[in-house]
Amino acid sequence: MESEPDQSFKDLSWFLQAIKDPQQTFFNLQTLSFSSSGNTTHCQLITESSMNINVTRDNLTSLSQIFIELATSLETQTSLRNLEFEGIFWEIELLQSLGLLLDNTSKIKQLAFRKNRFSEQCLNELSEILKRNRFLKEVMFLESSIGYRGATLLGSALQVNDSLEELQIWEDSIGSKGAEELSRMIEMNSSLKLFSIFDSSPFTATPLISAVLGMNREMEVHMWSGDHKRDRSLKLVEFLPESKTLRIYQIDISGSCRVAAALGMNTTVRSLDMTGAKLNSRWAKEFRWVLEQNKTLREVKLSKTGLKDKAVVYIAAGLFKNKSLQSLYVDGNRFGSVGVEDLLCPLSRFSALQLQANITLRSIVFGGSNTKIGRDGLTAVLKMVTTNETVVHLGIHDDASLGPDDFIHIFKSLQKNASLRRFSLQGCKGVRGDRVLEAITETLQINPLIEEIDLARTPLQDSGKADEIYQKLGHNGRKIDEAETDDSLKDMPLTEPKSVRAFLCGQNYAGKTTLCNSILQSSSASGFPYVENVRNLMNPVEQVVKTVGGMKIKTFKDEETKISMWNLAGQHEFFALHDLMFPSPCFFLIVLSLFRKPSNKEPKTPAEVEEELEYWLRFIVSNSRKAIQQCMKPNVTIVLTHSEKINLQSESFQATVGCIQRLRDKFQALVEFYPTVFTVDARSSPSVSKLTHHIRMTSKAILQRVPRVYQLCNDIVQLLSDWRSENSNKPIMRWKAFADLCQFKVPSLRIKSRNENIQIVETRRHAIATCLHQMGEVIYFDDLGFLILDYEWFCGEVLTQLIKLDVRKQSTGERNGFVSRKELEKTLRSSLQSPIPGMTSKVLEHFDACDLVKMMKKVELCYEQDPSSPDSSLLVPSILEEGRGKTQKWQINTHDCVYSGRHLQCDDSSHMFLTAGFFPRLQVHLHNRIMELKNQHGATYSLEKYLIAITIHGINIRVELGGQLGNYIDVLACSSKSLTETLRLIHQLIIPAIQSSCRGVILLEHIIRPQCVQDLTPPRFRQSQFVSLHRLKEALSSVPAETMYDYQHTWDSVLDSGKTVLRAGFDLARNLLSDDDFREVLQRRYHDLHNLAQELQVPTDENPEADNHVPVTNELEKVDPSFGGIAKGVEAVLQRLKIIEQEIRDLKQEIQGLRYYEHRLLIQLHHKVNYLVNYNVQMDERKVPNMFYFIRAENYGRRLITSMVPGMVALRIHMLCEFRREMHVVEDQLGCDVMQIDNQAVKCLAPYMTNFMKLVTFALRIGANWAAGMGHMIPDLSHTIAHLANPAVMTGAAGAAGAIGVAAALGRNRGRDRDIQEQEQRAAQQWLIDYLREQTCSTGRDIAEKFGLWRVRYRDDGSIAWICKRHMITRAHEVIQVPL
């Protein structure tokens, strides 16, 4: 136990003597504070490292003597680091003596002035001191009224000083002039790392943050405004260089324009958040330039900023040229359909051949009650959803202008989208009705790529129908962070929450409890309004004997904000509890001890610290992934304890710092780190004072960013506290008591008459209780009938004991992990009894044992063997044992069994994992889902610690947890049914249950080698024996249609100590994929070909007979033979074989239909080519070839030119051999140089280039031979066949209108008749004739030399063509040479 610090008062002479005496070894001062108050002069040792010296107002000269003595005795005071001054009225002589002290020491790093007063002469002297000092790192002024003049002098000093790293000016008024002076300092000073200011004027923020951004300073900035005396404060600006995040909470229009101008060439900001700031088109015009010039911005949030149509037009124009922005949030604004159209234009394509203008934006959110999307806006949304290839997250929030039919159209369009993963429709009033539900369900069946649909606060969710959608997506039904809303809740006002949680994460012996106590003590000593005592339900005797290990919660208040410190237990057996404790709003303190145990002096190695920190970061990310998608990244601060025992300059500590920095870089995209790593002595309140200040500021910032709550919740929190005080601190509140409290104390939740709709009031009460649950004030579930008011009691005593239950020691009737309800209740009573003889149990005093069982079932800690029986046995996963040593085999294993497996792996296992609580929860959750099935009779379900074994409908399934820290799940199946039926069961039952239990961690699906499944190969040997499902489908999409059914995937061999465990082999794709997967691949190929056919205007209805092969039929789904119960004999088996054979024939028929469709399109292609070659035989008697193209030399190769731009130089023109049905690129063709392309050339050639590139694209897609020489000249075909016939380019217009121009031009092309097309072809031909004449290449001989082509006439029809020498020889009997 640490001894109490000496609190006795000493006189000043004692202190002067002590600093002169080198024998005073106990005197190890780090912080020395000076104050001027009272009538006595004295000194007081606060802790072993901090002291306060108080002098009376008329005895300030004694401070000069102290400064001089300190200056001359520095060799004995090497530990002094900080000087603090409170209430000092400075005179010039006193300040000069302080300057003497600072000039004679390099040890003092911090100066703090609180409520000091300086004359102008003193400010000048202080400025001179700072100019010549090279050792100070931090200077802080608090309520010291330095004003404009002081800011000017500080700025001039810091223009010279290059060592100061932190400057803080709190609760002062430097004014805009002072801010301008400090901004000039920022332009000159590159060493300042932290700048904080709290000023009465909000206009001080603009010049300061503009200077930081304009000069690309890596400086952390915090700016506040308000009047602290009236408790009014507002954060204006925050810049965190560590996360490269700039947040602007409030700013005037001129200031916002100035900041935008500074952002243009900035390289330090990656995320810009201006949510709630008022902006207009003047700002947007400046911001357009930012989007066009800035290369580092990745995220922009402009929610609720009042933007109108004109402003959004500027932003959209910037998106056309932007190549870096990934996320844009413009919800809650006031623009209409015009704004929506412009906003989505750069993200849309108006032809399959047009290049999407912006391909970097991945997430876009718009909408709001004042955003009127309208008909035109809906059209733009449909076009974007249908054609966009890059957006992953689309959000339309709080919309009231679209109806159910509109959303049905949107979901229908989503069926064709291959990029969108998350679609958010929060608060949209038109998302209602069964037809919308059917549209969503149909879309999810057709498009399997959609991972999340957010229907929070929509009528569809309010009616309870959204649960079906969430289950299909693999989510946990209704979102946890959204309160239920309906018509009865509309008039309930919302407000910011007033409570926040700080989770202290760390292993045992990290010092979390000691640190928590010091934070509370520091907060109390800092003059905060008041501090709540720790919630305490036990008498002092019980506190002494209480076992360590539960969760501790301590609370204090900062103004109106309640901050709860949640001390998570460090022991491994409690990790499963942590999954239940992550609501919003919250942030995390990861506490790491630099020593293995506090009782010894053995420090941890950097690798040990790194391993521990990485675990907790992965743990936080794994549990916060869903929160990332909905709100914000988890906020994490790193704290190193026991730092007083080590040398912070040692190589070992610096190596530890390097390890921490590597992890921060690794997790930067998923976690919002506070840039400072705190090193503290957890026992010392002064040592944690900065950490305490950080906790206060972080809490306020987080509460401004999280979703709002019902205003009534903040009022009811106090009523619940009063109720507990009046009821002997009961931790449990029955629902009847809560209803009575609402009836008597809350008028808006009161039933006023018998004629009133009681159900509406009850709905409101339940909504308030649910909101309190989400805020972390209570624990409440609808069907349990009570509220838990004390988190610490429930988590620290009740759940902790439940997790640690060992029923095996007390149960005599255990059967396969099951225990009877009576035995479990008996065990609960004995485990929860008080350890003090004669004292009643504090748990069972408020909780009945049956309530505990209900709670365990609710949080999926156990399940009932027979839910229909009130005395059913229960299974508690904590009593399960591992199955090591047991023989692993399938229950059925015949020669006709089908073996299949799926490997579900974390998509980012380096940043997240399946937490320890996942698999026990999955064991219960999957059992409950199976029991809910209507046709589950006869199913068996057995468990081991890391295994779930299921038999249902004749299919045996094993679900295995694998990998270090649970990186993957293997689902293995042995079935007497077909592969398709087996995989349908896995995808409809097993995988959704797994996804809904893993807290939003994304799992990627792979196919396990069937031989590994059949032999139950140990997991360590099958790590290389799986292939990505997506990759296999892509491979099938790339092979010719006739080879799809026989496509093979090869497997590598597996060796163990030189011994072959698995031989190399292969499996046919049809034995790895279900018929559903095959049909999906076929549908996508049909879809791609259909789109290309439409672009070529190829008719698809000329051959009605072919249509019989094209559609994918669903006749097989009507075959549903029953395999339950006893087999019905040989006839049933033969019938089943016939069905399987029919499935194979149908699948082969569909593949044959695909190939036939490709053949039809190839014939149409030849017709199109022949038209282009011979569009007018009489035109100058074909004096020059028709089919020409341009290339450019690039990296020792050739690149096909797909678009013409005025001013292009160094091109080369080539021509194709035009022999019918065998057109090709001529090898070794010299070609002819084109020095420059002018505007006239572009106008003539653009329509020709459009038609030519369409044919090239289509030919390459269906494998036409004539395009074989083109493919290698088009590195990325899908993105380069664009800019065709771009009118904006031809007329020199701005690129911002390019996308609209292309859409209009290509739309006109489809409507032109043959005469117009001939005019376009004639213009291109005439340009070629004129050009060749200029190059003196107009004769047949010249063309043969340059292009290797000869003019011939076909013998059969007399048409003219230009063909190569090879065709001249091999097809001489078909042509006659016709020289010019």
Curated annotation (Swiss-Prot):
Domain annotation Roc: ranges: 493-702
GO cellular component, one term: membrane
Keyword entries, A-Z: Auxin signaling pathway, Developmental protein, GTP-binding, Hydrolase, Leucine-rich repeat, Membrane, Nucleotide-binding, Repeat, Transmembrane, Transmembrane helix
Coiled coil region boundaries: none
Superkingdom of origin: Eukaryota
Transmembrane portions of the chain: 574-594, 1255-1275, 1287-1307
LRR repeats, residue ranges: 26-46, 47-70, 105-132, 161-184, 266-289, 299-322, 323-346, 348-371, 446-472, 476-502, 640-665, 688-712, 799-826, 1023-1046, 1131-1154, 1229-1254
Any one Pfam family match given in the protein's UniProt record, by short name: COR-B
UniProt note on tissues of expression: Expressed in seedlings, roots, leaves, stems and flowers. Present in ovules, prominently in nucellus and integuments.
Localization: Membrane
Residue numbers binding GTP: 506-513, 567-571, 641-644
This protein's record includes keyword Isomerase: no
Membrane topology (UniProt): Multi-pass membrane protein
GO BP of this protein: auxin polar transport; auxin-activated signaling pathway; basipetal auxin transport; leaf morphogenesis; leaf vascular tissue pattern formation; meristem structural organization; multidimensional cell growth; radial pattern formation
Disruption phenotype: Severe dwarfism combined with twisted and malformed organs, and sterility. Loss of initial meristematic divisions in the epidermal/lateral root cap. Defection in basipetal transport of auxin (IAA) leading to several development aberrations.
Boundaries of every COR domain copy: 757-931
Protein's job: Involved in the basipetal transport of auxin (IAA) that modulates growth and organs organization. Required for initial divisions in the epidermal/lateral root cap leading to the formation of epidermal cells and a clone of lateral root cap cells, as well as for the maintenance of the radial pattern of cell specification in the root, thus regulating the distinction between the lateral root cap and epidermis.
Protein name per its UniProtKB record: Protein TORNADO 1
Species assigned in the record: Arabidopsis thaliana (Mouse-ear cress)
Upper lineage: Eukaryota, Viridiplantae, Streptophyta, Embryophyta, Tracheophyta
